[in-house]
Amino acid sequence: MSVSALSSTRFTGSISGFLQVASVLGLLLLLVKAVQFYLQRQWLLKAFQQFPSPPFHWFFGHKQFQGDKELQQIMTCVENFPSAFPRWFWGSKAYLIVYDPDYMKVILGRSDPKANGVYRLLAPWIGYGLLLLNGQPWFQHRRMLTPAFHYDILKPYVKNMADSIRLMLDKWEQLAGQDSSIEIFQHISLMTLDTVMKCAFSHNGSVQVDGNYKSYIQAIGNLNDLFHSRVRNIFHQNDTIYNFSSNGHLFNRACQLAHDHTDGVIKLRKDQLQNAGELEKVKKKRRLDFLDILLLARMENGDSLSDKDLRAEVDTFMFEGHDTTASGVSWIFYALATHPEHQQRCREEVQSVLGDGSSITWDHLDQIPYTTMCIKEALRLYPPVPGIVRELSTSVTFPDGRSLPKGIQVTLSIYGLHHNPKVWPNPEVFDPSRFAPDSPRHSHSFLPFSGGARNCIGKQFAMSEMKVIVALTLLRFELLPDPTKVPIPLPRLVLKSKNGIYLYLKKLH
């Protein structure tokens, strides 16, 4: 036999041997994964044995919850299963969906961490800021940032809010004469971003005029959808597989757009603080705004807040501070448009307090109680954040005696709670009197800003902004629904509409 033939035979044998070993290893890995799948599934089945649920596939879980009907399916379960039910995403992944105020009170009164399996998927986008942090790091960041939302800080923000809102309303004046309805969410999103930039990030100028910011708004919308898709895809839980997928490429590109925006905001303010006069002026303030707190905390102690931590907090508040408020306001406007009698009563109340609206102050916001009731009722029907997830750090027993072991992930369905007929009679009816001062309700029946120690740090900022937006808008426009474009709510990180939120604008003067 020739040397070349012998070498070829050895090479072929080596390849064959390698393939055999690879096949054996592959089968072993598959077997290990199958055993892990089985054991995890059995553990979950045992953990949830006290909680009935709709029928589900052994591998695909509750497939009927996918798509546009997800909220409708959840509401069917709210009516049929008391307090909570397990939702299976696939054979070895399930959450207990909770929509009972007593259950909510128990979970929110504990110190369970955010569910890592879900929220870690957000880390490439918003980093580990207040939303994702747990334990002592979360406590330290929360304590550091709480002063940014003190009443003394928020009061002068009303002027900034009003300036941003009037700019949007001026744009709407040009559109009001058209025969077609307009999609309001994009306009409102730019306006709330403008407000956050002015109030929390010391930004001069207007986001609504600069067309460059539209790409950031679009990126945030894409990230919402991509995150939602990834949570529901078993294969995309693996970072490597996801990063090589088309959705992974889109997600990373959108993250880069969002990061470019926040990096620019941080750099601009850091450059301004290099000016000794500006720095001294800021340090003399009795209370600092959000970004200055972050920057000065780092400047006074270089180890206290890293660049990574700094950007995580900016990314988190930039998203939460504008997108959730934009969602809330858009749905509030839709609710008022579809209930003109309540819209008119709000308008009359605002007119009695503000006149023509040329001036609005913090003190005015407590003088529009009926408008506030309507805002809260709209937030009940359309909660900006439809759900949050916790992972049990210890076992828990609920008031009805049912229990869960450590490690189970619990989804607090704010949407389900707010539409639960056992909590809110006739839950689909828009009834602002539910929030009258003398109207009794459970302490955990209304949670648009979550509850407990980890409630939304900016809830007072958001409520104040929504009051200013609604008041000034109703003085200039009548809001009318477009019956040909009824919005379809979708449960993303923030409650969105599949087909936008379209309204007709009728100029009043």
UniProtKB/Swiss-Prot annotation:
InterPro entries, per database record: Cyt_P450, Cyt_P450_CS, Cyt_P450_E_grp-I, Cyt_P450_sf, Cytochrome_P450_Monoox
Tissue specificity remark: Expressed in liver (at protein level) and kidney (at protein level).
Keyword annotations from UniProtKB, A to Z: Endoplasmic reticulum, Fatty acid metabolism, Heme, Iron, Lipid metabolism, Membrane, Metal-binding, Microsome, Monooxygenase, NADP, Oxidoreductase, Phosphoprotein, Transmembrane, Transmembrane helix
Spans through the membrane: 11-31, 121-141
Catalysis: reaction(s): an omega-methyl-long-chain fatty acid + reduced [NADPH--hemoprotein reductase] + O2 = an omega-hydroxy-long-chain fatty acid + oxidized [NADPH--hemoprotein reductase] + H2O + H(+); dodecanoate + reduced [NADPH--hemoprotein reductase] + O2 = 12-hydroxydodecanoate + oxidized [NADPH--hemoprotein reductase] + H2O + H(+); dodecanoate + reduced [NADPH--hemoprotein reductase] + O2 = 11-hydroxydodecanoate + oxidized [NADPH--hemoprotein reductase] + H2O + H(+); tetradecanoate + reduced [NADPH--hemoprotein reductase] + O2 = 14-hydroxytetradecanoate + oxidized [NADPH--hemoprotein reductase] + H2O + H(+)
Location(s) in or outside the cell: Endoplasmic reticulum membrane; Microsome membrane
List of residues binding heme: E320, C456
Enzyme class: oxidoreductase
Expression induction: By clofibrate.
Principal location listed in the UniProt entry: endoplasmic reticulum
Cellular component aspect of the GO annotation: endoplasmic reticulum membrane; extracellular space; intracellular membrane-bounded organelle
Required cofactor names: heme
Matching Pfam families: p450
GO molecular function annotation: 16-hydroxypalmitate dehydrogenase activity; alkane 1-monooxygenase activity; arachidonate monooxygenase activity; heme binding; iron ion binding; long-chain fatty acid omega-hydroxylase activity; medium-chain fatty acid omega-hydroxylase activity
UniProt similarity note: Belongs to the cytochrome P450 family.
Function as written in the Swiss-Prot or TrEMBL entry: A cytochrome P450 monooxygenase involved in the metabolism of fatty acids. Catalyzes predominantly the oxidation of the terminal carbon (omega-oxidation) of long-chain fatty acids. Acts as a major omega-hydroxylase for dodecanoic (lauric) acid in liver. In kidney, may play an important role in omega-hydroxylation of (5Z,8Z,11Z,14Z)-eicosatetraenoic acid (arachidonate) to 20-hydroxyeicosatetraenoic acid (20-HETE), a signaling molecule acting both as vasoconstrictive and natriuretic with overall effect on arterial blood pressure.
Identification of the protein by name: Cytochrome P450 4A10
Species of provenance: Rattus norvegicus
